Amino acid sequence: MSSKTTATKENALSKQEIDGRLSKTALARLASYRADGMIHLTPIWFDWNGKVFRLTLGAGRIHLKNLARDPRVSILIDQDPRLEKGIGAGAWAIMCRGTATLSQDAKLIREVTHAVLVKALGSAEADQYTEPVMAEGRTIVTITPQDWLTWDYNKAD
């Protein structure tokens, strides 16, 4: 385990490692630009299909207004078990900058909303909550990755 620097060639994640972690992890942090140039940053559930991030946002979310004006976005997915298990437990992170597109396609909204809920809550709860969540009015945000920065402290040294 290394603490010399956050991201190095030696501790970077491979494409397969990125896909594996993104397929299992449900919580990310999404950053978009507000009109005044400041960052708007919130936790969010997501789906990863091996090529793009897919998010389902409720009507009125600030991110939707921000992304309609400026599609630049950053997303962070990480785990740091050192906080509970000590320094030897390591930590990993996946940071991605990309471009967001917004969709109001009803079929896509249902598909992505259900996929995000299954990943976060499991099938039974997803089946129970998909319709109530859909009733809120949703927009699908698809993030196409452009730049990645990854690390896994368990790979370092």
Task: Place the predicted regions along the sequence by residue.
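Helix-adjacent hinge/juxtasegments
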Residues: T56-W92
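Amphipathic alpha-helical interface surfaces
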Residues: I18, H63, I109-T113
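Solvent-exposed residues in well-ordered beta-strands and their adjoining turns
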Residues: N49, G58, D78, T101-S103, ...
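A generic structural signal for nonpolar/aromatic side chains embedded in well-ordered alpha-helices
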Residues: L22, N66-L67, V116, I143
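Structured helix-beta-strand junction loops
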Residues: K24-T25, R69-D70, E136
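Charged, gly/pro-rich active-site loop segments
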Residues: S2-L13, I87-D157
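Short, basic/aromatic recognition patches
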Residues: S3-R29
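Short beta-strand segments
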Residues: T25-A59, K65, I75-I77
